[in-house]
Amino acid sequence: DQDCLPGWSFYEGHCYKVFNVKKTWEDAEKFCQKQSNGKHLATIEWLGKANFVAELVTLMKLETHVWIGLRVEDKRQQCSSHWTDGSAVSYENVVHNTKCFGLDQKTGYRTWVALRCELAYHFICMSRVPR
């Protein structure tokens, strides 16, 4: 629909597809990129998109977490976010190897959960609508 490739779903100028295979976070991102130019693991920047993605994933009946395109790049660096008192957020308290994020199956895929990047889960790719 809306010029997405067959099997992909349209929402707000992008196409999305949940893949029924399990990969590590890094392999899932590489897989998405190979689908064609401009594809990556899905990003979720607002509630409407979060709800759309949750519904799309729920339809697959996967029963596992699902990778999204969020990862802490370097736990030694401070995040660009800040606490309300202005101090920088650091990830020193994050469990080692827990720097990749997925949609939490237990909440109907409506919240994010920090996961070990080397574990294999299903994943959702997104791309801009082809012109």
UniProtKB/Swiss-Prot annotation:
It comes from the Eukaryota. It is found in: Secreted. Disulfide bonds join 4-15, 32-125, 100-117. SMART domains: CLECT (SM00034). The keyword Transport does not apply. GO terms for molecular function: toxin activity. InterPro entries: C-type_lectin-like, C-type_lectin-like/link_sf, CTDL_fold, Snaclec. Pfam families: Lectin_C. Residues 11-126 form the C-type lectin domain. The keyword Disulfide bond applies. One of its GO terms (cellular component) is extracellular region. Signal peptide: none annotated. Belongs to the snaclec family. Heterodimer; disulfide-linked. Shows greater sequence similarity to the alpha than beta subunits compared to other heterodimer snaclecs. Interferes with one step of hemostasis (modulation of platelet aggregation, or coagulation cascade, for example). This is Snaclec A13. It comes from Macrovipera lebetinus.
